[in-house]
Each structure stands twice: as structure tokens, then as C-alpha cells.
């Protein structure tokens, strides 16, 4: 479970990449990929040891939205704490 104090990071199997043709940010993992919205990409780029609360503060985003997004990816094994 991800809380405000959790320090989320991408799972080892997941990678963020920018598509050189479209400029879109992709979350790649074995045999799959997701095209991320700009806000989703910003959240994941800040998963560098900061707490979830610090990520929300940095982006001026509602903490509940950040936690929900990270929990969804956590359920898929793409984010760990």
C-alpha cells in the first residue's frame, strides 16, 4: 500500500522512455507499454527517493490523486516502495 510517507520508485522491470517521433512519454515493461499523460509522466519522473507527499507538493497536485495513480501502478507491479 502506498501512503503519503512512501517513497515510490519504478520497478526494475519498468522503464520510462520518450518516443522520439511523437514526444510522448511511454512506460515500458515486458511485452507491454503505456502512453502516459503529461501529469502521469511528471509523477513517475519524480519517483527518485522523494515521498509521495513531496511529489504531490512539487507538482501542486492533490495528494489523493497521486496516491491513487501510484497505487494503481503498484497493483500492476510497476511501482514499488
What kind of feature is each model-predicted range?
Residues 1-45:
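Acidic, low-complexity/disordered tracts enriched in E/D and polar residues
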Residues 32-81:
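Long, charge-rich, low-complexity alpha-helical segments
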Amino acid at each position: 500500500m502506498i501512503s503519503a510517507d512512501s517513497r515510490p520508485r519504478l520497478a526494475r522491470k519498468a522503464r520510462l522512455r520518450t518516443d522520439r517521433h511523437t514526444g510522448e512519454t511511454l512506460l515500458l515493461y515486458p511485452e507491454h507499454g503505456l502512453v502516459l499523460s503529461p501529469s502521469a509522466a511528471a509523477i513517475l519522473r519524480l519517483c527518485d527517493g522523494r515521498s509521495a507527499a513531496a511529489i504531490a507538493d512539487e507538482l501542486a497536485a492533490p495528494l489523493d490523486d497521486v496516491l491513487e495513480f501510484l497505487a494503481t501502478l503498484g497493483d500492476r507491479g510497476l511501482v514499488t516502495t
